[in-house]
Amino acid sequence: MDLRIVSQAGQCYRAAMTRPIQIIPSILAADYARLGDEVMKADQAGGDRIHLDMIDGHVFKNLSFGPRMFQALRPYTKKPFDVHLMATPAHAWIDELKEAGCDRILLHLDLGDDISNMIGSIHAHAMSVGLVLTPRDEAEDILPFLDHIDVVNVMTVDPGFGGQLFLHAMMPKVSEVRTLIGRRPIDLSVDGGVTQETAKLAARAGADCFVAGTSIFKSETKNYGDAITALRDAASQATKKSPETV
């Protein structure tokens, strides 16, 4: 796709943008010894949702959390739980994630499950569903599913580990995804390496949701409220300063 067209489409989106900015704390960067308190603090600090990475060590070479942990964390907040599912077979976890109190499942396109069937099954469990685009995926890969999902999550790092540097090369993909979404009521999130500066770049490209771990839970001041407010303000101001014409 011609990146000039993508840029122009991104400007059109920003000029008419009405979807609220959401800051979504990722507990992969939290203090594992006190996760309940960390989730509660992220909620009280203004986090809009809670991002839970479920990594089984097979898809990506890391281990994180599972449904029993999510169920244990559920009493600490009423904010929605988003599960970034990096475990196989993915379909085998839907029942347990629902029972654990999760609200949204984010699916990778290449984990061996039929995506259409997975989307249908997740909806049948009264949960919402999103698709994840890794740095290797193309924006067009989401096209067959756009009318059946609630969010597209563009990875701005290689998935599986926290604390990585933001991949600036993903910004054209964010703009392209925004163009493909059009006027559908679909959130567009970026996930990985989100700081005040990179949130500005992603917001200008069309993102409205920002999954942030290190910049919240490992902020220098340890004040999660200040960190979340700073990210939200950075993204909001970036869109306000965007071109008003197309």
Where are these regions (language model features)?
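Glycine-rich phosphate-binding active-site loops on the catalytic face of alpha/beta enzymes
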Residues: 107-113, 153-163, 205-227
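C-terminal helical cap(s) of enzyme catalytic domains, especially alpha/beta-barrels
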Residues: 217-244
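Short, positively charged and aromatic/hydrophobic N-terminal segments
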Residues: 11-13
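Hydrophobic faces of well-ordered beta-strands that scaffold small-molecule active sites
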Residues: 22-26, 50-52, 81-85, 105-107, ...
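Conserved anion-binding
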Residues: 31-34, 92-96, 102-187
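N-terminal active-site wall of soluble small-molecule enzyme domains
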Residues: 52-121
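Conserved, mostly hydrophobic/aromatic
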Residues: 35, 53, 97, 152, ...
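Glycine-rich, proline-tolerant flexible connector loops at the mouths of alpha/beta enzymes
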Residues: 49-67, 157-163, 216-220
